[in-house]
Design a protein with these regions (language model features):
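Globular "head" domains of long coiled-coil molecular machines
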Residues: 1-155
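Extended, charged coiled-coil helical stalks used as long, distance-spanning scaffolds
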Residues: 158-176
Length: 176
């Protein structure tokens, strides 16, 4: 997919792997990518929040394997109920963000609530109000302010990790 976005022009590369629950008994592709990812966006649906399965995956693979973690609560448009006031909707979204932050032991600033579908519709149609309501700007800001600038640090840690294991293997070979 080619999309002209400033984050992509600044070096952000996105690899979308299948969700673990969609993989059945062969999750190796997704799991093998976690330790090498510069950042991991853990996509959840806002209407279900963090399920028991999500929490198990988070605790077993994401927390120990990913250095930079962001939880993304997608589909906030499902909460846009015409019978609720904007303040009530905002309060419900904020509650779900707080719960997700607590469950995943993430700073609240690393939990974004978005509607990816509405963000795309807004971008295609040039609808600024819908784009703002989609919440995508918060996620883009998080990526732009923390992930892209940290790319050099992330790459340095990855090289150190790779070279460190090679040096250790060489040291063991020499010792034996």
């Amino acid at each position: 997919i080619s999309y002209p976005h400033p984050l992509l022009k600044n070096g952000l590369v996105v690899l979308d792997t299948p969700g673990l629950n969609a993989l059945g008994t062969e999750p190796e592709l997704t799991l093998s990518m976690i330790p090498n990812a510069h950042a991991l966006l853990f996509l959840l649906a806002i209407d279900t929040g963090v399920t028991k399965f999500d929490l198990e995956v988070w605790q077993k693979y994401v927390q120990p394997g990913a250095t930079r973690r962001v939880a993304v609560l997608n589909k906030i448009d499902l909460m846009w109920d015409d019978l609720k006031t904007p303040a009530e909707i905002e309060r419900d979204v904020a509650r779900q963000i707080s719960e997700t932050s607590a469950l995943l032991d993430l700073p609240r600033s690393h939990v974004a609530a978005i509607s990816a579908q509405q963000a795309l519709v807004a971008r295609v149609r040039g609808h600024d109000a819908l784009l703002a309501r989609s919440g995508i700007a918060q996620l883009e800001h998080l990526l732009a302010s923390e992930i892209i600038p940290a790319k050099q640090e992330i790459m340095r840690a990855a090289v150190k990790r790779e070279i460190g294991s090679m040096v250790e293997a060489s040291r063991l070979a020499l010792t034996s």
